[in-house]
């Protein structure tokens, strides 16, 4: 009875409640909880039937580990969505604003396809494998009425997407003012877009700490995916056969520095803000 009162009291306050139990008298509270946990070794059949989860080893430390993994999975989903939406907003904004400003087509369809394959594939998947952050269990639990984009997540997504789009357009326009051909401008824009997104994937590793405070080698799968994506970009820009396919040209030193400069400017601005 006391367990049942505890469960109902916390649920009235909007909390998500987990209740453990093993005896027949625990079954109502286990059933009432958001997540009912029964003991697999000492638990009665009635309690097991009422439970959502059966703890096979009766070790409550296993329950703590499960909560940690659950928090990690939820956090990684938010990171994954944050990264992909920011990148897509940046790509759409690049094309849309370029047309409004009367520029030539900033990126060709085959180049956009390359961007999606390079930045939306392996890095995004590797980001979803990010290990739990050290302080993940010290954070307060989420409320049951808390939305997925809570904590200003949507604002950060839109803001970062806008910066990616503006930096790509800035790279395109700067190379154009330097007298570069349309192909050179597109190549610079392609480099800026891909590199800025590859930098952003490392920013998405944490919602609490900036890129400059994270261990860059904390997720080696992500490092490998980013390196492979960068290699694909370099091949598309430097290999003559691929230049024909992706309509790129080898940038000169000033064009390359311009493209990389606009790529680096975005995380610096975000880090300062």
Regions of interest found by a model, annotated:
Residues 29-31, 48-49:
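Structural signature of FAD isoalloxazine-binding scaffolds in flavoprotein oxidoreductases
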